[in-house]
């Protein structure tokens, strides 16, 4: 399931860096929709490390992962700022 999420939702390049919390939040949303086991942030980080993604520190000290970034989300609601 993690491989499918990476394929569908992520971009891979050595220069990419993304926060662990952002990646995990997207993974959780995707996994819940797909009926997959979400697990913990720790487990997620371990699975990413097993796939040879390296940990890094982002500006401000936040934990990140190198070599991966989230794809921009498509607008699913048509008008995200529509004033009803």
Predicted regions and their residues:
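Phosphate-handling catalytic cores of nucleic-acid transaction enzymes
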Residues: 1-4
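Positively charged interface segments
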Residues: 7-84
């Amino acid at each position: 399931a993690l491989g499918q999420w990476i394929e569908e939702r992520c971009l891979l390049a050595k220069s990419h860096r993304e926060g662990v919390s952002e990646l995990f939040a997207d993974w959780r949303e995707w996994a819940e929709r797909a009926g997959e086991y979400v697990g913990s942030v720790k487990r997620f980080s371990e699975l990413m490390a097993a796939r040879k993604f390296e940990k890094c520190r982002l500006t401000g000290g936040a934990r990140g992962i190198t070599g991966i970034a989230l794809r921009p989300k498509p607008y699913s609601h048509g008008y995200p700022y529509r004033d009803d």
